[in-house]
């Protein structure tokens, strides 16, 4: 009698073994149905069969499901669990600690081949990730050896070992690292400074802020790990060490950059500081070398911005955060790392069509990215996304560096910067035309006209920086050669030569990248001194405040004037408040936290007690707008924080560029320089006239002379003489008290301006200025 087969009604991912009853033998044997053709019954879904086979982890029914709305169709693979994209990266079990990896020696055939670790085999959904980079040249071992606790012959994890996986993964971090401090936070992750318990070195660990909530976040994390592992070490690329997953949260261990990011460095600059041109060229060289290394391995970074550029302890720039990186196919790669173009990007079409990810993937990722440094081809034609897209992001980054203004995220200004009109926002004379021209060439809207990395590296100023670096290393080599010659010739002076060798070895360690340190160290020293001064002022201010509070508790205390402390982000000077309730609520804080907007130049004996704040009009783009006969009220770009706004009037205290740098070439602002000189002369005349009138038109010979006698102030701080005008909130005179209209006793605050010297000024008064002069509050 022929055996009967029980054919399942649902197609399975892996072939099953069907048991056959044999009448001749009491035993049973199994046959494979991998070659069986599917029947119409297999297209139907049987719930009983699904629930029965669901218990077996190696047999997953193929039940297609519609994709999520937020998930591109190209990413949906209903047959694979979510953990598949990250669990197939390593063969290490979650019970293996990081110290086992760090303590490995050369193992010959046991070395891990990470090039083949990104397989397509699906693993259990409870598996975790633990990857180490064997390309790390900093380790003397050269390669890692698989610990004996790992089964090298098994491609799948043991499901029993994952029952307590969360505790094992937590101990992986706690047993090997001590958290020192938190370095910063981003849109997707937090970065911590840690100290290894194994080797005592400091590292940076990036922890995802949220658990993986779908395909997009998981693939983005896997993409960053793949990009970091596939890149060999480079001086200008952040070094990757290892990564692991804990409770659906990714952890990445990298090298630590003590000086923070470039964004932190720019934010720490004071208003009287301006970056030297030589330092900017030095930064540009580091970024271009790092991007050239990334492009040489057919990879696009696509997220170049100051937040992702880190300053090492040696003063050079390192590129990090490969979360947006994409891989180009190896076919038709004829660029040889030339920045994406041959003969001004003539081979652009062959590279643009070799993206390993489709257009939906790139567009979806950049919805979560930063649009301030985004190239225009992402919106016009995503097929043009290629290596010059990274060059555009570099141009916007250095455009922000030389202007000191924050880049817009969208709107007309965003389009204007991508329409070859960035020259309108550059300040003439601040930096050389050569630097401006390179930045403008990197920001070309036409991708075929955009400058390449090879052309940037051939710039004479870049070549000069490279020559200075090369000369420094040659000097170090000459010192070493001289020491060897001294050791061979002076055999009788062994003690002296040993001392010379020790001194020179110390000098060699200190002189490595000393050129970078010489450029950036003055800024760090100035920042440290400024922080010490701020801390000292805070301590002194706290002591004065304590004394002030003690006097306020006594009835005989004399009312002390408010301390003026100007803060960025406060309300503008045109916001006038006169409500009685607001006066009562904000009486203690309004005088300290906001500047007084009128001049008390005639207070001869009380000028030291009252702070006078003055505004500097040279900190923004208003000077450029005045040259173009535009209104200074419509600033083209939103200004940065108070510390980022650069002042052009304090060039004496800045570090000027070296005289041997090229400042010749095509003058970009030849006509504008003449106009700027005329406008500066007019501005100086206007400032002299305004100084005679004081702030808001309070003349030096006006009614402010009545304030000389401080004895007229009563205990509440008001004038005892009723004939003298009272000072309202923000130091404005209360002209009158109007009764009527239902709101009895409502105060009207106004500012008295003097138009005697400039009668024609009232004709040019704009509505915005009128609102700043007169405002009524109920």
Swiss-Prot record:
Biased composition range(s): Acidic residues:
578-590
The entry's Mg(2+)-binding residues are 308, 321
Where are the catalytic residues?
303 (proton acceptor)
Specify residue ranges for compositional bias: Polar residues: 652-670
Keywords from the UniProt entry: ATP-binding, Kinase, Magnesium, Metal-binding, Nucleotide-binding, Serine/threonine-protein kinase, Transferase
What enzyme class is recorded for this protein? Answer: transferase
Q: So what EC number does this one have? A: 2.7.11.1
Task: Give the matching SMART domains.
Answer: S_TKc
Which positions bind ATP?
183-191, 206
Show the catalytic activity.
L-seryl-[protein] + ATP = O-phospho-L-seryl-[protein] + ADP + H(+); L-threonyl-[protein] + ATP = O-phospho-L-threonyl-[protein] + ADP + H(+)
Alphabetically, which GO biological process terms does the record hold?
DNA replication checkpoint signaling; negative regulation of G2/M transition of mitotic cell cycle; negative regulation of G2/MI transition of meiotic cell cycle
Q: What cellular-component terms does GO give this entry?
A: cytoplasm; nucleus
- A single GO molecular function, which one? protein serine kinase activity
The Protein kinase domain, residue ranges: 177-462
Question: Which stretches of sequence are listed as region Disordered?
Answer: 129-162, 478-509, 562-697, 757-778
Task: Specify whether Magnesium is a keyword of the entry.
Answer: yes
| Biased composition range(s): Low complexity | 599-651, 671-693
Compositionally biased tracts (Basic and acidic residues): 757-766
Domain of life from the UniProt record? Eukaryota
Q: According to its UniProt record, which protein family does this protein belong to?
A: Belongs to the protein kinase superfamily. Ser/Thr protein kinase family. WEE1 subfamily.
The name this protein carries in UniProt is Probable protein kinase DDB_G0291133
Q: What is the lineage of its organism?
A: Eukaryota, Amoebozoa, Evosea, Eumycetozoa, Dictyostelia
């Amino acid at each position: 009698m022929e055996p009967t087969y029980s054919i399942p009604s649902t197609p399975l991912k892996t072939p099953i073994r069907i048991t056959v009853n044999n009448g001749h033998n009491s035993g049973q044997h199994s046959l494979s149905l991998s070659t069986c053709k599917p029947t119409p019954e297999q297209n139907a879904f049987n719930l009983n069969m699904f629930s029965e086979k669901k218990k077996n982890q190696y047999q997953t029914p193929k039940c297609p499901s519609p994709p999520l709305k937020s998930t591109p169709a190209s990413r949906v693979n209903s047959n694979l669990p979510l953990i598949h994209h990250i669990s197939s990266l390593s063969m290490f079990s979650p019970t293996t600690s990081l110290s086992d990896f760090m303590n490995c020696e050369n193992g010959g055939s046991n070395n891990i081949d990470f090039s083949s670790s990104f397989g397509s085999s699906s693993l259990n959904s409870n598996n975790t990730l633990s990857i180490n980079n064997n390309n790390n040249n900093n380790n003397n071992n050269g390669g890692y050896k698989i610990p004996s606790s790992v089964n090298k012959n098994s491609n799948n994890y043991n499901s029993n070992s994952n029952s307590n996986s969360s505790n094992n993964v937590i101990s992986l971090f706690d047993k090997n690292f001590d958290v020192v401090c938190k370095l910063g936070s981003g849109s997707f992750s937090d970065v911590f400074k840690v100290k290894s318990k194994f080797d005592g070195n400091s590292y940076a660990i990036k922890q995802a802020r949220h658990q993986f909530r779908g395909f997009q976040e998981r693939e983005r994390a896997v993409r960053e790990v793949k990009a970091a592992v596939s890149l060999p070490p480079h001086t200008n690329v952040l070094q990757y060490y290892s990564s692991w997953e804990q409770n659906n949260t990714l952890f990445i261990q990298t090298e630590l950059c003590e000086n923070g990011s470039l964004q932190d460095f720019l934010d720490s600059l004071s208003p009287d500081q301006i970056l030297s041109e030589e330092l900017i060229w030095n930064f540009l060289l580091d970024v271009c070398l790092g991007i050239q290394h990334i492009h040489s391995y057919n990879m696009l970074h696509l997220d170049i911005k100051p937040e992702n550029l880190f300053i090492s302890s040696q003063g050079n720039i390192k590129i990090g955060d490969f979360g947006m990186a994409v891989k180009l196919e190896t076919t038709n790669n004829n660029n040889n790392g030339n920045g994406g173009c041959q003969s001004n990007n003539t081979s652009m079409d062959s590279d643009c069509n070799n993206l390993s990810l489709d257009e939906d993937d790139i567009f979806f990722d950049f919805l979560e990215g930063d649009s301030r440094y985004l190239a225009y081809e992402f919106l016009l034609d995503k097929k043009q996304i290629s290596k010059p897209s990274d060059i555009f992001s570099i141009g916007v980054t250095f455009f922000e560096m030389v202007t000191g203004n924050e880049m817009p995220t969208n709107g007309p200004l965003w389009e204007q910067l991508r329409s070859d009109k960035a020259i309108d926002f550059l300040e003439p004379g601040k930096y050389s035309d050569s630097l401006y021209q390179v930045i403008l060439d990197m920001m070309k809207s036409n991708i075929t006209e955009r400058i390449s990395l090879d052309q940037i590296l051939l710039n004479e100023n870049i070549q000069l920086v490279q020559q200075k670096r090369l000369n420094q290393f040659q000097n170090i080599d000459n010192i070493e050669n001289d020491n060897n010659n001294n050791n061979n010739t002076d055999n009788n002076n062994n003690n002296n030569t040993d001392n010379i060798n020790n001194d020179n070895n110390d000098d060699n360690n200190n002189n490595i990248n000393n050129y970078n340190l010489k450029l950036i160290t003055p800024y760090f020293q100035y920042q440290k001194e400024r922080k010490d001064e701020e801390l000292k002022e805070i301590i002194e201010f706290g002591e004065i405040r304590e004394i002030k509070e003690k006097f306020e508790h006594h009835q005989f205390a004399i009312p002390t004037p408010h301390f003026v402390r100007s803060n960025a982000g406060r309300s503008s000077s045109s916001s006038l408040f006169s409500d009685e309730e607001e006066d009562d609520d904000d009486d203690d804080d309004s005088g300290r936290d906001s500047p007084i907007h009128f001049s008390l130049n005639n207070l001869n004996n009380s000028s030291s007690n009252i702070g006078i704040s003055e505004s500097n009009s040279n900190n923004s783009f208003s000077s450029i707008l005045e040259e173009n006969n535009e209104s200074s009220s419509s600033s083209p770009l939103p200004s940065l924080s108070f510390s980022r706004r650069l002042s052009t009037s304090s060039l004496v205290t800045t570090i000027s560029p070296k005289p041997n740098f090229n400042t010749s070439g095509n003058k970009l602002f030849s006509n504008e320089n003449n106009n700027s000189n005329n406008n500066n002369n007019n501005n100086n005349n206007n400032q002299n006239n305004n100084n005679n009138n004081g702030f808001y038109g309070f003349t030096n010979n006006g009614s402010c002379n009545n304030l000389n006698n401080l004895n007229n102030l009563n205990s509440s701080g008001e004038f005892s003489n009723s004939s003298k005008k009272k000072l309202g909130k923000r130091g404005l005179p209360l002209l009158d008290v109007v009764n009527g209209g239902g709101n009895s006793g409502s105060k009207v605050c106004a500012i008295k301006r003097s138009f005697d010297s400039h009668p024609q000024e009232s004709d040019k008064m704009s509505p915005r200025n009128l609102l700043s002069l007169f405002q009524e509050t109920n």
